């Protein structure tokens, strides 16, 4: 029976190699990723078979576990292809495979019995008897339904011998754990086949059939409204409750999010979990953690269903995106002498710009760009997107640290 109140695993998304490196750099204990087929995030980049092998080697070398998503609901014509794919998974040897379809669970149990099976949140697990049922089918972990309260999760943990996993940060679906047909209806993209176009995030208005050119906002608000637009989940203020509930793994949503978002969120929850594990008696949420999460690209935050607050669960009726105005500059590729760094530039930067650098530990540090040059060390006044540049900073940093420009007039970016 698993320990109920041990330090939980921090599980982060890894939609491609760059995101994998960032998740590892900022402290994830495990990552979830996918191949090119049979995943619910076909637009996140994902990995070819050979890339999966490399990704697993990279993660395992850093003592980070890898969970491979195979969480679509499959059709008859895919069964032979699924068998071939599962045989490949067996050779790749991820730490677990994430599945929702009982038919794929059956195949995986037969073809790759040496690989742990984690049940996807798409399976809508909401009570301890359901967990017991899945355990009899060789499931080793259940990603619980997002619709559960913290007290309900505690009851499940106390009445089962299964590892549990729960989302703690990121986008939430307006439908029951992703069972939605809006995307199918409006764009002919199947949300349960990895092709969701997120129409719940679109801006809608009411049109009266005899006045086709008159658009009326659903709420009396000059900005209109987002009829289905869920707030984002954020549980940074409730790490003690999550840990004390005995949840085995705390999961961050976002395989399609950029590395600026990923670095910020993984770092923040890593720091919070470690702080609570080190001294639960004097633990307190740091304002710098809240600040970090509030300055990345996000919708209004809430605690979802964890505390049963209907207002918290309500749609986001304001702007779809919030966050501090800053520009993501790029990431450090390597050190280039004392306090000089080769940087992959994502947004324009000028010499003497004020920037902040996010490292895995401690708060973000500010610095001026004290010198700027091309990779062949030719001095320049600015560096353009999709180039590399050598920049001089006032402090010591490391490869994969994230750089952001302060007080930019550009909107928050996340790529």
Say what each PLM segment does.
Residues 24-27, 107-111:
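Alpha-helix C-terminal capping segments
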Residues 44-53:
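Aromatic- and glycine-enriched glycan-recognition loops and surfaces
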Residues 103-104:
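Alpha-helix capping/helix-boundary segments
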Residues 80, 114-115, 119-128:
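Gly/Gly-Pro- and Ser/Thr-rich, intrinsically disordered tail segments characteristic of DNA damage-repair
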Residues 1-26, 30-40, 55-56, 62-72, ...:
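Surface-exposed amphipathic alpha-helical tracts and adjacent flexible/coil segments at the periphery
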């Amino acid at each position: 029976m698993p320990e109920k109140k041990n330090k939980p695993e921090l599980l982060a998304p890894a939609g491609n190699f760059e995101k994998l490196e960032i998740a590892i750099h900022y402290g994830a204990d495990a990552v979830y990723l996918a191949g090119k087929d049979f995943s619910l995030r076909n637009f996140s980049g994902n990995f070819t078979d050979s890339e999966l092998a490399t990704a697993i080697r990279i993660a395992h070398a850093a003592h980070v576990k890898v969970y491979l998503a195979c969480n679509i609901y499959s059709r008859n014509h895919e069964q032979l292809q699924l068998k071939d794919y599962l045989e490949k998974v067996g050779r790749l040897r991820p730490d677990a495979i994430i599945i929702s379809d009982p038919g794929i669970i059956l195949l995986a149990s037969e073809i790759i019995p040496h690989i742990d099976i984690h049940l996807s949140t798409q399976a809508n697990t909401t009570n301890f008897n359901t967990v017991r049922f899945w355990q009899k089918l060789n499931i080793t972990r259940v990603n619980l339904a997002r619709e559960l309260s913290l007290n309900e999760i505690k009851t499940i943990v106390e009445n089962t011998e299964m590892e549990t996993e729960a989302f703690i940060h990121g986008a939430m679906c307006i439908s029951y754990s992703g069972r939605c047909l809006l995307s199918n209806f409006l764009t002919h993209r199947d949300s349960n086949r990895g092709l969701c176009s997120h129409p719940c995030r679109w801006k809608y208005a009411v049109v009266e059939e005899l006045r086709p050119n008159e658009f009326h906002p659903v709420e009396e608000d000059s900005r209109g409204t987002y009829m289905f637009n869920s707030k984002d989940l954020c549980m940074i203020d409730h790490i003690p409750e999550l840990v004390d509930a005995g949840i085995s793994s705390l999961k961050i949503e976002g395989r399609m999010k950029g590395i600026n978002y990923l670095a910020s969120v993984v770092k923040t929850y890593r720091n919070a979990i470690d702080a609570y594990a080190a001294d639960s008696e004097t633990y307190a949420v740091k304002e710098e953690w809240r600040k970090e999460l509030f300055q990345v690209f996000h919708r209004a935050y809430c605690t979802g269903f964890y505390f049963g607050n209907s207002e918290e669960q309500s749609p986001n009726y304001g702007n779809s995106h919030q966050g501090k105005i800053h520009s993501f500059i790029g990431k450090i590729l390597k050190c280039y002498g004392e306090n000089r760094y080769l940087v992959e530039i994502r947004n324009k930067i000028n010499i003497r710009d004020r920037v902040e650098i996010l490292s895995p530990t401690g708060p973000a540090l500010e610095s001026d760009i004290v010198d700027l040059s091309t990779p062949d060390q030719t001095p320049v006044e600015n560096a353009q997107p999709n180039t590399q540049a050598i920049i001089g900073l006032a402090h010591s940093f490391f490869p994969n640290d994230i750089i952001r420009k302060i007080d930019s007039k550009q909107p928050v970016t996340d790529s």
